[in-house]
UniProtKB/Swiss-Prot annotation:
InterPro entries: Beta-tubulin_BS, Beta_tubulin, Tub_FtsZ_C, Tubulin, Tubulin/FtsZ-like_C, Tubulin/FtsZ_2-layer-sand-dom, Tubulin/FtsZ_GTPase_sf, Tubulin_C
A Pfam family that the UniProt record links to this protein: Tubulin
Amino-acid positions noted as binding GTP in the UniProt annotation, renumbered to this chain: Q11, E69, S138, G142, T143, G144, N204, N226
GO cellular component annotations of the record: cytoplasm; microtubule
Organism placement in taxonomy: Eukaryota, Fungi, Dikarya, Ascomycota, Pezizomycotina
Molecular functions per Gene Ontology: GTP binding; GTPase activity; metal ion binding; structural constituent of cytoskeleton
Source organism per UniProt: Erysiphe pisi (Pea powdery mildew)
Cofactor: Mg(2+)
Protein name per its UniProtKB record: Tubulin beta-2 chain
Database matches in CDD domains: beta_tubulin (cd02187)
């Protein structure tokens, strides 16, 4: 079976990761200690994509939990699903990275990284046919951003031909955790552009908006935000965990979604959005799902796709859905919004189906889009980065850990290049676009 090894690093990564495991354990009929008491064989059929089977009908997540301070790990351990994880897979330091990317990437994190890689290796060896890795982390802090990207590059070295998917929480425009967020995020994007195969961008502010606007929660907690993220993660990984007619795995998703290797930053959305505990009291139809799924208010990253164009996108429908209806609706959306799709990639919408809906819903859909408007997000961080870097504000925290200013300049220009690349393909018309696309294809064929 095509297994996936999951890593969660830093406070944010561990909290999102914990929510993810809670969600998929529920979908597979596992209780808080990993014992199976589900109702359907379908829950078991592909259990081993994410779980190892232990003795006594118990299943253990193939997860590695990493942090540079013990706090969040203790919270995960004390949580409702704390007994699920294998105790040896908790790897933590004592010192913390203090929101400093350099500490996570070069000093504190580098000391811990071999220990983590041992655990990763052990998990990878227990797999029949490892498909790839997924990592949850944030880009604004020290551990998730600095050490997370260090782990990604180390795993890349050791498993060059396996997929690397990241669920990355990007800094949001208005809600900021720390002053040095723009530094940490830019340095991280610099790494992700080179080392990740697919990055699902999530941002707290967009999640807040969804909670307040759509779910009518007056003051959403991180629990509510994480619940949304875990719904998307569960949706994106559905096809891997349940048999379906139109299955996709990480690699298929990447092949369909990434037209140029550097442009692999996706926006995600989920429908129907219901608040925790409030299962919907009305039937949802495929047209409604499609409608809500393509709604800009539904995107979990603060960039509006109407300011750019979709290179590619993918929709995953779950539940008892008629194949024909889905195709019709998707065609419908494309015709209605044809201005927002680039015309030089024909059939750039991919659909996958899975017959098992999430808990408490009859049907749902998950949306993954590769839109050029994601550049807004990088632009925003880039502007904040430039403002501080021009004055060399806060730099001593990084140079003190042995970093060089040159590295900052490199990261900045790499991110600016990324923005320009997105812009270039957004402006490309069918005549010039096809030539470039064909050139790319020729180059790839020659390789």
């Amino acid at each position: 079976m095509r297994e996936i090894v999951h890593l969660q690093t830093g406070q944010c990564g561990n909290q999102i990761g914990a929510a993810f495991w809670q969600t998929i354990s529920g979908e597979h009929g596992l209780d808080g200690s990993g014992v199976y008491n589900g109702t359907s064989d379908l829950q078991l059929e592909r259990m081993n994509v994410y779980f190892n089977e232990a003795s006594g009908n118990k299943y253990v997540p193939r997860a590695v939990l990493v942090d540079l301070e013990p706090g969040t790990m203790d919270a995960v351990r004390a949580g409702p699903f704390g007994q699920l994880f294998r105790p040896d897979n908790f790897v933590f330091g004592q010192s913390g990275a203090g929101n400093n990317w350099a500490k996570g990437h070069y000093t504190e994190g580098a000391e811990l990284v071999d220990q983590v890689l041992d655990v990763v290796r052990r998990e990878a060896e227990a797999c029949d046919c490892l498909q790839g890795f997924q990592i949850t982390h944030s880009l604004g802090g020290g551990t998730g951003a600095g050490m997370g990207t260090l782990l990604i590059s180390k795993i890349r070295e050791e498993f060059p031909d396996r997929m690397m998917a990241t669920f990355s929480v990007v800094p949001s425009p208005k809600v900021s955790d720390t002053v040095v967020e723009p530094y940490n995020a830019t340095l991280s994007v610099h790494q992700l552009v080179e080392n990740s195969d697919e990055t699902f961008c999530i941002d707290n502010e967009a999640l807040y908006e969804i909670c307040m606007r759509t779910l009518k929660l007056s003051n959403p907690s991180y629990g509510d935000l994480n619940h949304l993220v875990s719904a998307v993660m569960s949706g994106v990984t559905t096809c891997l965990r349940f048999p379906g007619q139109l299955n996709s795995d990480l690699r298929k998703l990447a092949v369909n979604m990434v037209p140029f290797p550097r442009l692999h930053f996706f926006m995600v959305g989920f429908a129907p959005l219901t608040s925790r505990g409030a299962h919907s009291f009305r039937a949802v139809t495929v047209p409604e799902l499609t409608q809500q799924m393509y709604d800009p208010k539904n995107m979990m990253a603060a960039s509006d796709f109407r300011n750019g164009r979709y290179l590619t996108c993918s929709a995953i429908f779950r539940g008892k859905v008629s194949m024909k209806e889905v195709e019709d609706q998707m065609r419908n959306v494309q015709n209605k919004n044809s201005a927002y799709f680039v015309e030089w990639i024909p059939n750039n919408v991919q659909t996958a189906l899975c017959s098992i809906p999430p808990r408490g819903l009859k049907m749902s859909s998950t949306f993954v889009g590769n839109s050029t408007s994601i550049q807004e997000l990088f632009k925003r961080v880039g502007d904040q980065f430039t403002a501080m870097f021009r004055r060399k504000a806060f730099l001593h925290w990084y140079t003190g850990e042995g970093m060089d200013e040159m590295e900052f300049t490199e990261a900045e220009s790499n991110m600016n290049d990324l923005v320009h690349e997105y812009q270039q393909y957004q402006d490309a018309s069918i005549s010039e676009g096809e030539e470039e696309y064909e050139e790319e294809q020729q180059l790839e064929n020659e390789e």
